[in-house]
Amino acid sequence: VVLTVVLLTRGEGGPTPAAPAPTSPSSTTTGPPGVDTTEDATYASARPGYPDRLVVPALDVDAPIRPIRAPDRTLVPPADPQVLGWWADGARPGADTGSALVVGHTVHTGGGALDDLETLAEGDEVLVHSHRGSGEEGPERTESYVVQDVEVYRKGTLARRAADLFSQEVDGRLVLLTCEDWDGTRYLSNVVVTAVPAADEDDSEGTARG
């Protein structure tokens, strides 16, 4: 599934990506009713949860996350600039495959959770706290990511790069998106931050040193 982004900038600074139809939910296999095997319990606790908070220590950000969808193919962040939106039809943070997309408004006068997103640097830490879904067992999770790339794209460039930036076919990663380049009436660009699981980053560094 490819997420195509159409930048409809407004004074509030919210990116509004146009999204495809939701993907089919993945199927799971469970044991017989009333039987909870160790393997089943381990699998349940290992599944990614639903994100409810983003923490970015370098930006002093600790913001709630709400699931958002795109019934009209337009993904709009929550109206409150201190609240972020997670594209619920894409990957969950912690999933092995796919880009988990989190978006938020930028406020040119200040007050948006992602106002300073473009100042992140490679290697900065990003944490996503998740909860279990209704009827799911297992502890709450915290996914640790490391910033890999920070880019600013104009509208046309972002549209051309969307298939790669928001791909659901890549190894699991986190993508943060907000607006940038306020010209007095609207935002002209988007900031896109790509972060990879911290464990993956540690493995790659160990291989490079080896």
Can you annotate each of these PLM segments?
Residues 4-121, 125-210:
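Solvent-exposed, non-transmembrane regions of membrane-associated and secreted proteins
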